[in-house]
Amino acid sequence: MDGATIKTQQYTLRRKKGFIMNHDITNEVLTEFSTAFSSNPVNRIAMNAVTSAGLLAASKNPMAQRESRHSYSISLEQGEITNQKQSGRCWMFAALNTFRFEVIKNLNLKTFELSQNYTLFYDKLEKSNYFLESILETLDEPTQGRLISFLLSAPLGDGGQWDMLCNLVRKYGVVPKEAMPETVSSSATREMTAALTRKLREDACRLRKAYADGSTLDELRKKKEAMMEEIYRVLCICLGEPPKTFDLEVTDKDDKFIRDTNLTGTAFFEKYVGLNLDDYVSLINAPTADKPYHRSYSVKFLGNVKEGCPVRYLNLPIEELKKAAIAQMKDGSPVWFGCDVGKDSSRDEGLLDTNTYQTDKLLGITFGMNKAERLEY
């Protein structure tokens, strides 16, 4: 073969320029890599920048900030900024912010905040029950199978969806932040969630072993009730016990004092928020071949309130999604928005922009997948 040799034992093709690597990383291969790296002085400059400043800082694109202005043609009145701190409650904060918009408007307030700790308590409680019920539904599945492994991977993570918050609100309502303020564990959930995750995995183990030993479903549900009592106790210790009733006391923009006593969470929502949650649906843009547009989708074993509505998404082309969001804001209502906020974002500048960083140019590589491919892979 002209210009090439074949070593059949190592399955290596060697050519005049470069080579096709076999299944091993050999010293010869490393030498080739090092020579290629050192031959381009741009690599040395990039290495100096990234090792000193970090990849994102070194690849930040200043033009992205210059071209992104925080001035908008549609601007809705909003209260003071809320802070989820060291927790994964972004979806919950965003939904409660849409609800408090109605409270601020209806009571003529400068600002107002709903208790995120209250909804966190019941979200963790309901997710625990949802998890244990899922374990009871899958007792015949192999322990090492993909389904059980999936269920055990994160029994009650902080994350959630719009429909999950709606399920909580329909059942428990909402309360002012003063009625159930933040705690250390609500603002930094990692330690509490780790303890609950460990306990729920143990509970799953006990339920599956009891089933293997011949326990009936009724007997397993009695065990589950005792397990849920323990979960409730842990949540009370970490987050405090939710109020059954509370008093609303606020002062409006005109310095008028407002008091409403002996309210429940559901009564407060009906009276001061007043939204019909059945009128809302989550819109997504998932341009994958297995999800045709203008259809709704759900994910099995994704939820919190077992008897609640399933998590649903209506898949739309991105332009239709944008039109719907703009129309809702023009109508005077905020839009709940969820995304993979860790991608292409800069907290310092408040940017969510695919041009925020130029890591591909800095590293000399390409990121060529389209959105559908990124969702699939």
Locations of regions flagged by a protein language model:
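Long, well-ordered hydrophobic secondary-structure segments characteristic of membrane-embedded
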Residues: 57-146, 151-159, 166
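N-terminal regions that are enriched for targeting/export leaders
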Residues: 22-79
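Short, Lys/Arg-enriched N-terminal segments with co-localized hydrophobic residues
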Residues: 2-20
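Active-site-adjacent substructure of cysteine-protease-like catalytic cores
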Residues: 86, 151-155, 189-193, 198-203, ...
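Aromatic-residue-lined binding/catalytic grooves and analogous aromatic/hydrophobic interfacial grooves
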Residues: 193-303
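Structured segments of extracytoplasmic/periplasmic soluble domains
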Residues: 93, 101-106, 168-175, 238, ...
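N-terminal amphipathic/basic membrane-interacting segments and domains
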Residues: 307-311
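Internal, well-ordered alpha/beta segment that forms a basic, Gly-enriched binding/recognition surface
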Residues: 119-239
